[in-house]
């Protein structure tokens, strides 16, 4: 291997090595599963959109919304199917963020006559590349 090829190889190796050592930022990934129906029937799409715009967007600093078809069974064995909205929210682990999420869930439950909202929290490392 001539010196030019070796120099190019070394340069590429150093660049890739530096890239592989990017700092990982520890965050919390919260998933919120909102059922979009209640005892009166499906929650109108316009009502969900208004709640999302007026409450969620003013509470969380950013999120991703996914839509799904949910299935669940209550304690007596009765089965239910409903549309759902899933919010994914990446945030710093803090009491303030926990309070914001708890407040959002409480407001949703009151406004749409819901028993619960499923919440899943995971510690994650995030990277912007």
Enumerate the predicted regions with their spans.
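Positively charged, small/polar-rich N-terminal and surface patches that mediate targeting and assembly
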Residues: 18-129
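Bacterial Sec-dependent N-terminal signal peptides
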Residues: 1-22
């Amino acid at each position: 291997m001539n010196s030019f090829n070796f120099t190019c190889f070394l340069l590429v190796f150093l660049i890739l090595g530096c890239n592989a050592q990017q700092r990982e930022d520890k965050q919390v990934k919260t998933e919120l599963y909102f059922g979009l129906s209640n005892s009166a029937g499906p929650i109108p799409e316009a009502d969900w959109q208004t709640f999302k715009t007026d409450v969620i967007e003013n509470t969380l600093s950013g999120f991703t919304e996914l839509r799904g078809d949910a299935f669940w069974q209550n304690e007596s064995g009765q089965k239910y199917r409903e549309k759902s909205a899933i919010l994914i929210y990446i945030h710093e682990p803090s009491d303030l963020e926990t309070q914001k999420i708890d407040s959002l869930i409480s407001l949703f439950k009151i406004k749409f006559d819901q028993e619960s909202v499923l919440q899943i929290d995971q510690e994650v490392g995030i990277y912007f590349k």
